Each structure stands twice: as structure tokens, then as C-alpha cells.
């Protein structure tokens, strides 16, 4: 089925989508440094989206999941390499579908969660408070980690250097991260 869509819409696929995602992070960091108030208007907040600030459906992608540090820079370089490899392996269209559907499902899931929690906690919290609370947890962290897990599933025998010294097969990093996700839930 995806092959039919690929033949029809493959010409619209964005090459180097990972690079654009990382460039978005850089733009987001620059905005946060120059104008923190404007950066606050870019974040995801279901309450504000449902009250007219619809740009937040898209601009939350510019917000970084972590604060800027040397580890963030290393992470971005790693995700660029993993994303480029997945794009070459799967093809541009399928990689686009993978990332964009992850972004769309994140937005849909957050809005559904907001609506459900608004009804459940309507007497305890204001809908604006719930929107801010949910918005604080919506980031591209899980999108980035899904790139990592997809790479681990596609290339389980590849090695990463832990602390730039110890070679470990990426499948074990994937297993550890999968266990972390299950414990975190």
C-alpha cells in the first residue's frame, strides 16, 4: 500500500529531513537566546491551540528536548548520521512518512490527552493549567529516540563507542533504551 502512495506522492518527499529538523533546533535555540518571550509562543500548548494560536501545531518542532550543552551537540551529530543512514536505506519517502507521522501522532496524542484530562480533572485544574502541563512534556525527544531505535532495529550489529572508547553493538543500546521506556511509563 505504501508503494502506491510512494509512486503518487514520492516526488513531494523532503530530502535530508533530519538536517532540516536539526536546523529547526538551531533556530529554536537562537530564538530562545534572543527573545525568550517569542520562544514561549513557539511551544506546544493544547489550550492555546484550541484558543486560536494554531501555529503552535507546527512551531513546537523548533523547541529542543534538552538544554544546550556539549552532549546536546554530540546528540545532534549522532541523530544526523543515523537519520541520513535510515533515509538512504529506507528511501526518502518512507523516512519522511516515518518522521512526519511521528510528529502528527505526537500532536494528535497530546490534544486527545488534553481533552480527556480536561474532562477528568475539570474540578481540580483549569484547562489552561492542563494545557501548559501537557505542553511541557511535548517535545521531539521521542521522535529522536524513535530514530535511534529504528536504526538499532535496522542495523543491530553496528557499533557505537560508549564514552568514545568502549565499542558496544547498537542493539544493546536499543534494548537498554526500550527497557528505560517501559520503566518510565
Task: Give residue spans per PLM region.
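A detector for small-residue-rich transmembrane helices and their helix-helix packing motifs
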Residues: 1-185
Amino acid at each position: 500500500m505504501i508503494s502506491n502512495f510512494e509512486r503518487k506522492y514520492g516526488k513531494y518527499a523532503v530530502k535530508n529531513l533530519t538536517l532540516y529538523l536539526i536546523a529547526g533546533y538551531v533556530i529554536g535555540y537562537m530564538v530562545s537566546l534572543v527573545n525568550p518571550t517569542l520562544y514561549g509562543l513557539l511551544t506546544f500548548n493544547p489550550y492555546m491551540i484550541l484558543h486560536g494560536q494554531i501555529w503552535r501545531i507546527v512551531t513546537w518542532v523548533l523547541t529542543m528536548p534538552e538544554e544546550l550543552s556539549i552532549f546536546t551537540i554530540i546528540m545532534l551529530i549522532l541523530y544526523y548520521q543515523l537519520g541520513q543512514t535510515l533515509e538512504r536505506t529506507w528511501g526518502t519517502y518512507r523516512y519522511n512518512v516515518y518522521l512526519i507521522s511521528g510528529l502528527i501522532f505526537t500532536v494528535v496524542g497530546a490534544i486527545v490527552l488534553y481533552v480527556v484530562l480536561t474532562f477528568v480533572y475539570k474540578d481540580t485544574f483549569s484547562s489552561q493549567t492542563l494545557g501548559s502541563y501537557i505542553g511541557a512534556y511535548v517535545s521531539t525527544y521521542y521522535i529522536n529516540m524513535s530514530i535511534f531505535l529504528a536504526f538499532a532495529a535496522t542495523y543491530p550489529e553496528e557499533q557505537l563507542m560508549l564514552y568514545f572508547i568502549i565499542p558496544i553493538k547498537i542493539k544493546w543500546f536499543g534494548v537498554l533504551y526500550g527497557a528505560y521506556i517501559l520503566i518510565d511509563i
